[in-house]
Amino acid sequence: MKSFCISSLTLLLLSILSIHAQDNFRVVSPEQLKPTVFDFLDDHRNLSDTELSKSLKEYLVAQGYTFVLVSVSKTAGVTTLQVKPGFMGKAKVAGNQYLDEDGILDHLDWETGQPFNYSKFYNQTSRLNRYRFVQVDSKLKPVRGHDGEIQVNADFNVEDQLPLSPYISISNDGTEQSSGWRTRVGLEIWENFMPNDRLNLSYSLDPKDASQLSSYFASYQFGSSDFTQTVYAGYSDSEYENVTSSSLNMDIAGDGFFAGYSAVYPIGLVDPDSLAVNFGFSYLDLSSQIYLGNNKLLASDEDLTLFLPRIGLQGKFANPFGLRGDGFWSLGAVSDLSSSDDNELNIQNPELEKGFWVPKVSFAIVEPVEFLGAKGGIKFKLDGQASSEPLPTSLKKSIGGIASVRGYREREAYGDTGMSMSLEYSMMSEKTSIFGLDGNVQNIFFYDAGYVSNEGVMASVNDSTGMQSFGAGLIGNFEETADISLQVGVPLADTLNTPMHDARTHFSINFRF
């Protein structure tokens, strides 16, 4: 008993001393770096001052803070850990004839006075230089200030042309009612009315039979990283013949107009990307007809108009436990605010009623890893929605295909409630050459899963679908003008339209001119 009391007293004293030590330890650092610094300190509690300074600097350099300075000092019993990452200084832009100087700096995410991260700067520069009409040659000029911190000035020499970027893409992500193939032709135009705005125009069709599907789309993005806004509109027209069997001879035709607005407004106090409000609305005006027999007798004619406001929160965070990657999340809801017409809803489903709302959630983590000496990265994604009542088809969660569960048909299953998950490992990019084109190719391996279910008395007891798959593929970029993706998924669960182990290939290629 005496031994137990002594041990307890010792632990209590150690706890008090630990708390006292923490109270006399302070970190002086830009707010953006403090989460990263504290994560490191949590994982390295027993380092000496010299070891702490050296190890933390090496860690931050690996995180991209090339010019970081770390020092540990003690004054009057207080230990101060000071981190000076270096900051973005003066930027000089020259040579640009078409693109605005502020727009170029915004694309490079250059903001004077903010911490300088070389990895982020390199990625932003590479992303901008992928466009045919602009090339930015960067010359960094670090200088040391009176307090020892590095100020990174930069000269940007720009060669630009008229900022037009035509593109064409081919993919097999169409639904099974059509040929399954899609061709899209489009044009992206920068700085139409203001710096850093983009106008995108595109036309999509089924290349096997354009009469089965044609779609027009336009979007205009404007604003800055402090307040990004987008307006969009489109129209689609489709007609599918013999959708059930040639003997029944049932054709379905439909057309629809849609338009909307979306915006993202950062509200993070420390890092603007850490928290933001997203909001907007969509307007849908849909019409569909069903024809029967060789004479194409009209059997059904439906119209549906929906106005769908939405609001939510989204954010970004540094992965915990000393990991080097980032995490992303969003939480929001979509509703018709009781503006729908019950008569139109009842034609689609007698159980549908206006006033529905749909909560949605998404979560993703990206983390660089090294496996068996090979560098790569892991990406985990999860998104879903929930509803306790039946929803219009356009609001149901879909699974299957390249965007959710690979190995299955595109948008094979729908549900009022559903989720999809993806775990993907990507290897380091490798340089290669195909048909005389130089580029980079990256191998990927994945596991996908998804589940949807429907609500209401019209839904059967087993009106739910689950999917699982694994697979591999490659993604590549050639001459900064062509992107290619080739992925093969193997289903691990039977569905109504896809048997287990019946592998499916997902392909897409995009050319920019």
What are these regions (language model features)?
Residues D49-S53, E58, G64, L69, ...:
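Outer-membrane beta-barrel initiation region
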Residues I150, S179-T183, Q212-Y216, D255-A259, ...:
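Residues that define the transmembrane beta-barrel architecture of outer-membrane proteins
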Residues N294-A449, S453-E455, P499, F507:
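C-terminal outer-membrane beta-barrel translocator/porin domains of Gram-negative envelope proteins
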